[in-house]
Amino acid sequence: MKTVLDGIITKLSPSRVEYVRGCAIRDTTVNEIEQAIEAARRSEVVIVVVGGSSARDFKTSYKETGAAVAEEGSVSDMECGEGFDRASLSLLGRQQELLESLQKTGKPLIVVYIEGRPLEKNWASEYADALLTAYYPGQEGGNAIADVLFGDYNPSGRLPISVPRSVGQIPVYYNKKAPRNHDYVEVSSSPLYSFGYGMSYTTFEYSDLQVVQKSARCFEVSFKVKNTGKYDGEEVSQLYMRDESVSYTHLRAHETK
């Protein structure tokens, strides 16, 4: 399993990388924030990996209902998966404190999220110099993340979900408008990042869009995509459709389907 640290070291060398744990995912007794601050002050760039985990720690038992029960005196870093439900989308433990402390050093701050569910990213979207959502990236994920961070691979992924600003917005559907089109008292009603959102190190230009109706139920869509930036890259072209009129099935009295 390649961690993000492993991937970064392969790009540089162990002598050029200073690692500090900082904090745990959930356990607030793990506190190396001051050590992380000192390391950040000695560094040119700060890369912080935060988020969650669904890795079984084998200290957790499960009830017949599937609910997770941690051993007394231990705090599992697992916060996602079967039996692990969340009441908020915030970073757990001291992770938010770690981010804010490192940002105050004034060094360029890159935040990498490892997550199994969309976590709240309001602070990072405003204060971080770069933000990368990697979800659970797999066995070679550390190398893949390092490739993106060091510019050896141009990211082209697009969000498969909408990222909410607050747990109060859930559910956030890309294909369903809110029943009332106005903002909340505290935040905008729009998602922080919409379904299909993503960034690239280059830019693309679309032109010559044509939609040709081949038959009553068949349309052909064509267009040109040009890379107008300085770097090679891949583009995910997205096409969204909706019915102008939708047929409804009217049930008879006492029918359920």
Which ranges hold each PLM region?
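C-terminal non-catalytic regions of proteins with extracellular/luminal or membrane-system context
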Residues: 1-252
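A short, hydrophobic C-terminal helix/tail in secreted or cell-surface proteins
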Residues: 253-257
